[in-house]
Structures are given as structure tokens and as C-alpha cells.
């Protein structure tokens, strides 16, 4: 059984309700049909029901078991307006502005549904930027208790079954924080270890990646990773973690023996923490596009309720996978 099939099985054990607000995207319609067919989650779509069903007919898929909520006709609109206003009034939100946003911005509408406990999570981004998808989630849902920083990760399911957790890795931060400070990198390592345990396997082994291994290069970027590693050891001593290794020293035991003898990672990393968003974004896309890996994300970690992004280059199968992962995250909230 593949990694994502195991996640689907977990999702079915305690079925959750996930919002897919991008009802004008054919990949989303195809994914919604498959999700309800496989019993992975209950799906809410946002928009005009007639248009959505017309799209389903054109694609020859069955969306009869999908719930459609039209912001213009839902009896809960006033409740949602009040909830958005109360959540954001300190930032200048008015009831009038909240109503206008909810009638026109389906992403925000979906997030407010999650905030109101009318859905357990949301997945979007097939036709919106990461910023457009995640900004309202961060503004409305806030961080989970005890979490210092919201960050983004990818689950990378590779063909290299002798590495990672049977070929599966967690990459962070590949979608949100542009240039994390040492303190933020350490926090990302901690939340990534929790995400790994909840979604992939019991024993995260974390590499704080750099272009240097144990002082082989001198640069401010290297210093940042070294300091992040020191902070992580101090604040999160339970983590199996080391820095700063190059990628080969993180993944190949023979290279680790030569470059980083005595490292607790020892070439067996399954959680890769990138020094900045450039490295993380490029890294996951290289592994996906040239290495043939399945990439699920960017998934948010550290947020109060699960809202996850999609690459605009995603397939409908990717959406199914991210919804399954989101449903499992929702089981753990």
C-alpha cells in the first residue's frame, strides 16, 4: 500500500468535512467527485450550485453527494459576517466590509466556515497564489496553542524506499517564511517533528540543511543554521537533530561518516529543514519534477485548524491527496 493510500485509510476511519472553495476549477471538481466516491471526506463546495453541477455534467462526474453552499443564499451569512467582524474588528473590519468580503471572496468564506466549526478544514490554491490562500487563514484562524510560528511543509513521497520513512520525507519551510531567523528555524524544526509524527512515522530525524557541513564553509547563511541548531538543542532537547549538514551528509550514511562523524542524523534524515524559502521551494520542485516524487502541500503547521495550500500546477490527484492529509490533520485537532 502506498503512503497516500495509508493516509486515505486513516481519513476514512473518522470522516471529516473539508471545504473546497475553488468550484470554478475543473481539477477541483474532478477531485471532489473522487473524494466522495472513495469516502475520504465529506466535501463542501462554495458557489452557485447550478454552475457547479453544469461543470460536473460537462466533466461527466457525479457531485450529487457534495454539499454546495452559496454565499448569496445561505441562511448563515449573517452569522459569518458577525464572526468575521468580531475576529478582525481590531484591524479595522466593519460589518459592511465583512459582508462584502464574504459575498465575493470564496477563500475567506471557506475559512470562516472552518472558524465557525461548520467544516473541519479547507484546501485551496489550485487557481490562487499561496499568499492569497494562506493570508486569510493566518488572519482568521490564528496559531495553535503553544506554537510560536506558523510554517509550511511538503510531504514528499519518493521512489527511494530505503531512505526517509519508506521513501517519504517532510520538507520545511517550502511555502511561507521567506528568510527565517535562527529562532524561527528552530521552531520550524520542532513543529515539523510533530507533523512528521502525526502524518508519516514515529521517529523524525531532522537535518538543518546548509551548503556547509560542520564548518566546511564560512558565511552568514551557515552561521544562521549553526545558531538555529544550537537553539533547537537548547529549547527542544528531545529532538533527534543536527546541523549543519549538506544534503548528501544528511541522506547518505557513507558520506555522513566522512563529513560528519558522530552526527546523530548519520545520513538517515527524514525531515529536511531548509535555510530559507528559496532553497526549500527549489528543493521540493527538483525532487518532484526530476526525481519523480509525489509532493503534497504546502501544508500549514502550527495553525489552529487545518487549512492547506496547493501548487497552481497541481493535478486533481494532488488535490485528493492533500484533502486526505487535511482530514487526518483535522482528526488530531
PLM feature segments, named:
Residues 1-266, 271-333:
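Anion-binding alpha/beta catalytic cores of soluble intermediary-metabolism enzymes, centered on
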Amino acid at each position: 500500500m502506498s503512503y497516500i493510500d495509508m493516509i486515505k485509510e486513516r481519513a476514512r476511519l473518522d470522516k471529516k468535512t473539508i471545504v473546497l472553495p475553488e468550484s470554478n476549477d475543473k481539477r477541483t471538481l474532478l477531485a471532489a467527485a473522487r473524494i466522495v466516491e472513495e469516502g475520504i471526506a465529506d466535501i463542501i463546495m462554495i458557489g452557485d450550485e447550478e454552475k457547479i453541477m453544469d461543470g460536473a455534467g460537462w466533466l461527466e462526474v457525479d457531485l450529487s453527494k457534495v454539499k454546495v453552499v452559496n454565499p448569496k443564499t445561505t441562511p448563515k451569512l449573517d452569522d459569518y459576517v458577525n464572526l468575521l467582524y468580531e475576529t478582525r474588528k481590531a484591524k479595522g473590519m466593519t460589518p459592511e466590509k465583512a459582508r462584502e468580503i464574504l459575498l465575493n471572496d470564496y477563500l475567506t468564506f471557506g475559512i470562516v466556515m472552518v472558524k465557525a466549526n461548520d467544516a473541519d478544514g479547507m484546501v485551496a490554491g489550485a487557481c490562487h497564489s499561496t499568499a492569497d490562500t494562506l493570508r486569510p487563514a493566518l488572519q482568521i484562524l490564528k496559531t495553535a496553542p503553544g506554537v510560536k510560528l506558523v510554517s509550511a511543509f511538503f510531504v514528499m513521497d519518493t521512489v527511494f524506499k530505503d531512505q526517509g520513512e519508506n521513501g517519504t520525507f517532510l520538507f520545511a519551510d517550502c511555502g511561507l517564511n521567506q528568510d527565517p531567523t535562527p529562532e524561527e528555524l528552530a521552531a520550524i524544526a520542532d513543529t515539523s517533528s510533530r507533523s512528521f509524527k502525526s502524518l508519516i512515522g514515529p521517529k523524525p530525524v531532522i537535518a538543518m540543511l546548509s551548503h556547509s557541513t560542520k564548518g566546511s564553509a564560512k558565511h552568514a547563511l551557515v552561521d544562521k543554521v549553526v545558531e538555529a541548531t544550537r537553539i533547537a538543542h537548547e529549547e527542544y532537547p528531545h529532538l533527534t537533530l543536527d546541523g549543519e549538514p549538506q544534503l548528501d551528509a544528511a541522506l547518505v550514511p557513507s558520506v555522513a561518516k566522512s563529513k560528519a562523524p558522530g552526527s546523530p542524523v548519520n545520513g538517515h534524515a527524514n525531515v529536511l529543514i531548509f535555510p530559507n524559502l528559496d532553497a526549500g521551494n527549489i528543493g521540493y520542485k527538483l525532487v518532484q519534477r526530476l526525481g519523480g516524487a509525489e509532493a503534497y502541500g504546502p501544508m500549514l503547521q502550527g495553525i489552529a485548524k487545518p487549512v492547506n495550500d496547493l501548487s497552481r500546477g497541481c493535478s486533481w490527484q494532488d488535490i485528493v491527496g492533500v484533502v486526505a492529509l487535511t482530514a487526518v490533520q483535522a482528526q488530531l485537532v
